[in-house]
């Protein structure tokens, strides 16, 4: 229980502090670890010498494991970097086909035979490829509104790359020229305190240069002036609204974290975790398996995983139901036994003679005491 509490405090600390100097944040974490180490040393002192000796030996084993794990993380990072380079030619081919830069052999001829030459000249690549892929994923679909779809039709590619100092990763969204904003590339960068055990330090996004009247993250409300008002023009008010493009304006912790109360800090932490979920989903799922999300195959695979989890839960419930049924049967058997014993007691009363009433009564009393139901005996 205490370990869970300690890990929760560490997570709160990492998301609540937002020092301009990253070293200051790391020092704060070190101080927290030192305090925890002091608490753990108190635990060791309270142990008996033999148990303390065993625990110290277990800690040595843990240190050996930690060294191996650190080496694993190092080798894994190198392996991922190696394969990330090998993936690039495949990503390039995908980009060229999706955007009609190159044509798949035989595709143009099939279109000509089915729809005519004029149609084949208009339709190139795979229209709305990234929009459909994003809409088919449950996490990213929740962020996309109908107003966003027009702009996301111009999305040509999504890439991700590692960031070394500080550790993290960057997402790049490449857009064709469009009537919504001037930017051709929108980026989102996640800076991590610990890349292997993801603790988010901060996230940064591109400032979108919206064309006049095209901002998708805000909506303009027009209200009629009150009757009798000198101003006859409608009152306009700008209000923030839901949009996928809010993703590029991530939640930020104020410079002075003392301004945050507990409720505000919890809400902000939830927003940052949700923002990271979106980014990691795009990085780990959408980019690497884009065509599967476009076709819906990835959705089916996700559904199968969910169904497997549900089946496990159902099996557990069935086992519990079976145990409950067995318990009910045992209770019914006990009740039947008690009724039989009671009937036998009544019969013995009738058969006993008047001369033996006292003896019968004493025996009956003893019988009643000795034949109490199991639950009474336990009391």
Curated annotation (Swiss-Prot):
A motif (Nuclear localization signal) lies at residues 222-227. SUPFAM superfamilies: NAP-like. May modulate chromatin structure by regulation of nucleosome assembly/disassembly. May function in nucleotide excision repair (NER). Involved in somatic homologous recombination. Residues 26-80 form a coiled coil. Keywords: Chaperone, Coiled coil, Cytoplasm, Lipoprotein, Methylation, Nucleus, Phosphoprotein, Prenylation. Residues 347-360 have a biased composition (Basic residues). A lipid is attached at residue 376 (S-farnesyl cysteine). One of its GO terms (molecular function) is identical protein binding. This is Nucleosome assembly protein 1;2. Can form homomeric and heteromeric protein complexes with NAP1;1, NAP1;3 and NAP1;4. Binds histone H2A.
């Amino acid at each position: 229980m205490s370990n869970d509490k300690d890990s929760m405090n560490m997570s709160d600390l990492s998301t609540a502090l937002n020092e301009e100097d990253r070293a200051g944040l790391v020092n704060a974490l070190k101080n927290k670890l030192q305090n925890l180490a002091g608490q753990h040393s108190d635990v060791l002192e309270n142990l008996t010498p033999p148990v303390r000796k065993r625990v110290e030996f277990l800690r040595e084993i843990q240190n050996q494991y930690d060294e191996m794990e650190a080496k694993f993380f190092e080798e894994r990072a190198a392996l991922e970097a190696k394969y990330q380079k090998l993936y690039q030619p495949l990503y390039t081919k995908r980009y060229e086909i999706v955007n009609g830069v190159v044509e798949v052999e035989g595709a143009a001829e099939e279109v000509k035979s089915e729809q005519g030459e004029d149609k084949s000249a208009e339709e190139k690549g795979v229209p709305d490829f990234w929009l459909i892929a994003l809409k088919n994923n449950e996490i990213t679909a929740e962020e996309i509104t109908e107003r966003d779809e027009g702009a996301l039709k111009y999305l040509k590619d999504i890439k991700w790359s590692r960031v070394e100092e500080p550790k993290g990763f960057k997402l790049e969204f490449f857009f064709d020229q469009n009537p919504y904003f001037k930017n051709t590339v929108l980026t989102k960068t996640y800076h991590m305190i610990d890349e292997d055990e993801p603790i988010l330090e901060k996230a940064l996004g591109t400032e979108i240069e919206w064309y006049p009247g095209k901002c998708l993250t805000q909506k303009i409300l027009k209200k009629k002036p009150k009757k009798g008002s000198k101003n006859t023009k409608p009152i306009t008010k700008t209000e923030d609204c839901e949009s996928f493009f809010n993703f590029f304006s991530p939640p930020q912790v104020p410079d002075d974290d003392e301004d945050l109360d507990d409720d505000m800090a919890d809400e902000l932490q939830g927003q940052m975790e949700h923002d990271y979920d979106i980014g990691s989903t795009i990085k780990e799922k959408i980019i690497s398996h884009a065509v599967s999300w476009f076709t819906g195959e990835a959705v089916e695979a996700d559904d199968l995983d969910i169904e497997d989890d549900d089946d496990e839960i159902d099996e557990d419930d069935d086992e519990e139901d079976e145990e409950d049924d067995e318990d009910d049967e045992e209770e019914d058997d006990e009740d039947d036994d008690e009724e039989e014993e009671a009937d036998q007691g009544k019969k013995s009363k009738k058969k006993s003679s008047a001369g033996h009433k006292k003896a019968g009564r004493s025996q009956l009393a003893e019988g009643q005491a000795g034949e109490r139901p199991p639950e009474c005996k336990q009391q």
